[in-house]
């Protein structure tokens, strides 16, 4: 995961029922309508919106609990009286320990992997994790990133699938999407009124073991 070695994802997928994997995607907030359960799903051949991806990644930062996106939290009348309040739907998708295992791997993407320029080029040294993404023919460049309190993402591409970058060097997520996310996070941390603390740390589950056992893989807990 740190270096985007997709063959590892393919090896894991060969040990997981594609139908079960599809159910897991739904649990994480990905719209799976029209997606055929196939082993190639691990390589991301189907489309997903930035909103869906942010929703999915928030599960890792939120201790394994998925929170459905909510764009309106309350409605007030012209006098300031609250007409209605809305609460997001939440459900536990994976255990807190499994969520932190994913966090641990995604943090290594930034600390020593494909997202390394977050540190050495953009000088963001706070606790954070992320993942770069690049599709075939360099048509899409992705970067999903998160801190303990904020999950966000960036996609660079075109609605027309024939639009693509000329080369992997220019079209990869680390080159096209990551810089946008990095500048955005710099703005977020610079604006103290937003209340995001760059020194905030991720909560480590009590008794956390960073090793993934064979039983975890067979049971699908490492998803």
Question: PLM features: what roles do these ranges have?
Answer:
Residues 1-62, 108:
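Active-site-adjacent helix/loop patches that line small-molecule binding or acyl-intermediate pockets
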Residues 2-3, 49-222:
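A penicillin-recognizing enzyme superfamily signal
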């Amino acid at each position: 995961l740190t270096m985007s070695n997709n063959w590892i994802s393919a090896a894991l997928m060969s040990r997981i029922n594609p139908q079960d994997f599809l159910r897991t995607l739904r649990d994480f907030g990905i719209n799976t309508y029209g997606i055929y359960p196939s082993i190639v799903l691990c390589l991301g051949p189907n489309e997903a919106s930035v909103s869906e991806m942010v929703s999915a990644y928030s599960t890792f930062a939120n201790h394994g609990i998925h929170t459905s996106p909510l764009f309106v939290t309350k409605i007030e009348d012209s006098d300031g009286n609250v007409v209605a309040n809305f609460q997001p739907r939440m459900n536990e998708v994976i255990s807190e320990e499994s969520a932190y295992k994913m966090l641990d791997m995604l943090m290594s993407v930034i600390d020593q992997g494909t997202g390394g320029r977050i540190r050495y080029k953009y000088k963001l040294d706070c606790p954070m994790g992320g993942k770069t993404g690049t599709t075939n023919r360099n048509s899409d460049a992705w970067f999903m990133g998160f801190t303990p309190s904020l999950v966000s993402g960036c996609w660079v591409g075109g609605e027309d699938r024939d639009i693509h970058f000329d080369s992997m060097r220019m079209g990869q997520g680390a080159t096209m999407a990551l810089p946008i996310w990095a500048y955005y996070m710099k703005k977020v941390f610079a604006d103290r009124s937003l209340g995001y603390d760059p020194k905030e740390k991720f909560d480590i589950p009590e008794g956390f073991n960073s090793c993934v056992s064979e039983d975890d893989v067979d049971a699908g807990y490492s998803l």
